[in-house]
Amino acid sequence: MSSPRDRVNAFYKDNLQFKNTRVVLNKEQLLIERPYMLLAVLFVMFLSLVGLLAIAGIRLHRAAVNTAEINSGLTTSIDITKSIEYQVKDVLTPLFKIIGDEVGLRTPQRFTDLTKFISDKIKFLNPDKEYDFRDINWCISPPERIKINYDQYCAHTAAEELITMLVNSSLAGTSVLPTSLVNLGRSCTGSTTTKGQFSNMSLALSGIYSGRGYNISSMITITEKGMYGSTYLVGKHNQGARRPSTAWQRDYRVFEVGIIRELGLGTPVFHMTNYLELPRQPELEICMLALGEFKLAALCLADNSVALHYGGLRDDHKIRFVKLGVWPSPADSDTLATLSAVDPTLDGLYITTHRGIIAAGKAVWVVPVTRTDDQRKMGQCRREACREKPPPFCNSTDWEPLEAGRIPAYGILTIRLGLADKLKLTIISEFGPLITHDSGMDLYTPLDGNEYWLTIPPLQNSALGTVNTLVLEPSLKISPNILTLPIRSGGGDCYTPTYLSDLADDDVKLSSNLVILPSRNLQYVSATYDTSRVEHAIVYYIYSAGRLSSYYYPVKLPIKGDPVSLQIGCFPWGLKLWCHHFCSVIDSGTRKQVTHTGAVGIEITCNSR
């Protein structure tokens, strides 16, 4: 039997004993197992952190995208709101205010002043006080053997003086600058940049007709020293007709004149101040315009070719003469003009679209004429010009005098605009550089001297335009300036236009008239209807004498088709060159004739190196 001590020891043998017991730890095993556990815990924490960061990044990205979309929408809304506010506040409101002031305040006041001025001047016939008659001396002491209608003459004189005063005050606020101040790149030694600004803002009558959908055609617009003048045919249809079968259209010949103004829009605006609208008649088919001295003058005929004889025109040929002041006055007229005795050598004149000038109380135009002595004086010149590689005009059938073998000369048409002058049209003529087509002749006044610039437009894909000089006093002389070729064997002064090679640019469908800019150095502009681009365009070319290259700027058109006519007019305004165009096109889709008009401001800047 075991002893009690053995039983106690047996009870505690398999139990932990803390007293007097030594525990031996396996340190190597602990050192190996503990890092694995820590790494496992850290890896789990790292994965959790990465997951949280990924979730946070996705949410932040979504929030940023939503915020960007909201900001973009707000920015667009703000821009649209600002644009509308600008249009209403800075453009439309001042424009309507200006129009309202002009129509409601200034124009009636000017007419009131005009009426009062005329009444005061007429009272001199029975004066009740002292008058200063120095400005109308003819009303007091007319020259001998001159019979005038005192009432009419003095009223018209007073009206013209007031018109001059009103126009000068109106033009005083405009920003017309000489072209010499317009940067046309003359001082650039490197490359240049050409920029354009399009504008169709207008206070002209033609703009109102276009807005109403009336058909405008045969439009000619010319500018001169802050004024503009134009003429065109307009077809007015009955807009109140309920059925097309009951609609009708009436055609009118319209003449309008006005001033070019700055209305706070940054662009020049044609502001019509006077107009005349006449029912379309045979003698109003073809018209020539002249502008100057605050007047517009026009000569109109039924046909572009008129046979002449020593006594003047035949009875069936009528010349319609129209004169309009920049402001309406009793001196405005619409009447028939008579042709004074004609030089016996003249037998025909040919009229197209011609630009004339008004200077020294006379309106002057230049047109082609035929003379009976053409073969004797210019026959050798023509034969030599057509001998080797004859240009197209040698066998041309497109123009009546060339088809008949005639050699046209230059005819100067002059009509005096004085109130005491009879409306008689005089013609003098002289030969000069050969005239090879009937695209028109335009006359421009130089800044100094007594020479005039005479331009002949280019002939599309055939001949370049020419710039000649014309001297009226002491004797008529037409001399070549640029773009002509001398014929050495032609004898004397024999020149022809510069004809192009057969490799012409087929993308150029039509050329415009040549416009001389008012500068001391010869500068001129022409335009072409170009189809080389996806959108058809009018391409303006700016030339300066002495430069081998030109500047150009294309104006995209909203229409496409076959061009019928292209007429331009250019003038300096501010630091830009503004050109107005009227283009007629046979639409390629509808095959109907459509028109496009507008103005573009061209600015040429030098690129810094």
From Swiss-Prot:
Top-level taxon: Viruses
InterPro entries with a match to the protein in the record: Hemagglutn/HN (IPR000665), Sialidase_sf (IPR036278)
Principal location class: virion
Membrane topology recorded in Swiss-Prot or TrEMBL: Single-pass type II membrane protein
Residues linked to a glycan: N168, N200, N215, N395
Keyword terms of this UniProt record: Glycoprotein, Hemagglutinin, Host membrane, Host-virus interaction, Membrane, Signal-anchor, Transmembrane, Transmembrane helix, Viral attachment to host cell, Viral envelope protein, Virion, Virus entry into host cell
GO cellular component: host cell membrane; membrane; viral envelope; virion membrane
Intravirion domain ranges by topology: 1-34
UniProt cross-references to Gene3D superfamilies, sorted A to Z: 2.120.10.10
Pfam families recorded: HN (PF00423)
Localization annotation: Virion membrane; Host membrane
Virion surface side of membrane: 59-609
Transmembrane segment boundaries: 35-58
GO terms for biological process, alphabetical: symbiont entry into host cell; virion attachment to host cell
GO molecular function: host cell surface receptor binding
Function of the molecule: Attaches the virus to cell receptors and thereby initiating infection. Binding of H protein to the receptor induces a conformational change that allows the F protein to trigger virion/cell membranes fusion. Down-regulates human MCP/CD46 cell surface expression.
Family recorded in the similarity comment: Belongs to the paramyxoviruses hemagglutinin-neuraminidase family. Non-sialidase subfamily.
Entry protein name: Hemagglutinin glycoprotein
Gene responsible for this protein: H
